[in-house]
């Protein structure tokens, strides 16, 4: 498990910047999914449930002014930065694994 910091800037306005930290990369990717789900709930307040596909989630990620991760590397005792493309790849792997486990 690698400590992971998620840096989020929803719009071009710098004062909207925020961050969250997680105990692992997977927890962080789940956090990005939850952030999108909260966005969908705000956009559809009267809907009893929400559904989406991965392309919609990726569009949301792409529409953020900035989204990046800092992942702790024990070997160098530093944080390695990663961009949106890396985040989308990790989300894809996470969701594919969850779908495979649900199908068992």
From Swiss-Prot:
Which top-level group of life is the source organism from? Eukaryota
Question: Where are the bilayer-spanning segments?
Answer: none
Please give the function described in this protein's UniProt entry.
May have a role in the cell cycle.
Compartments reported by the entry: Nucleus
Protein name stated in the entry: Enhancer of rudimentary homolog
Q: Name one GO cellular component term.
A: nucleus
* Family annotation (Pfam families): ER
Provide the alphabetized UniProt keywords: Cell cycle, Nucleus
Looking up Gene3D superfamilies in the UniProt record yields:
Enhancer of rudimentary
Family of the protein in this entry: Belongs to the E(R) family.
Checking InterPro entries in the record gives: EHR_sf (IPR035912), ERH (IPR000781)
Task: Quote the subunit structure annotation.
Answer: Homodimer.
Q: Does the keyword rRNA processing apply?
A: no
